[in-house]
A protein has these predicted regions:
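Conserved active-site tyrosine of GNAT-family acetyltransferases
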Residues: 24-28, 85, 112
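N-terminal beta-strand motif that seeds the catalytic metal site of vicinal oxygen chelate
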Residues: 1-22, 69-71, 118-122
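Conserved short beta-strand elements that form part of the metal-binding/catalytic scaffold
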Residues: 34-68, 107, 114-120
Length: 122
């Protein structure tokens, strides 16, 4: 448990979940001069956006009642952090899952919103 609380966990990625990826990408391109880059991912597409040197970003199309930004916070051990969130009363929306560059899970609290937990491969 101490490993989970050894300092602040930084946000390393922001991802917009939306029902209209094309229009959302165009909105942010016009508003903030972001230049979304189309990345093929499995059977879908992902719009990667450059948010600066410290934070990655993207826009993903999915079924959602309303668009929402999902922050990814880096953790040391994905399984421990996910279980810690569960003990704090969060619902686990996505159990820890491995991807090409790390592991992620998504947790939700009725009072604190949703956050993705991220453990990069080293």
């Amino acid at each position: 448990m101490n490993a989970i609380r050894t300092g602040s966990r930084r946000v390393v990625h922001l991802e917009l979940h939306t029902g209209d990826q094309v229009r959302a990408g165009a909105f942010y391109a016009e508003l903030l001069q972001w230049r979304p880059e189309l990345v093929r991912a499995g059977s879908g597409c992902y719009l990667a956006v450059d948010l600066g040197p410290a934070v990655g970003g993207g826009i993903i199309e999915c079924q959602t009642r309303r668009p929402l930004w999902l922050p990814y916070a880096e953790v040391e051990r994905i399984d421990d952090a996910t279980e810690h969130a569960r003990r704090l009363g969060a619902a686990v929306l996505l159990e820890p899952r491995e991807g090409p560059s790390g592991w992620r899970s998504v947790v939700s609290s009725p009072v604190a919103g949703e956050v993705a937990l991220w453990q990069p491969k080293r």
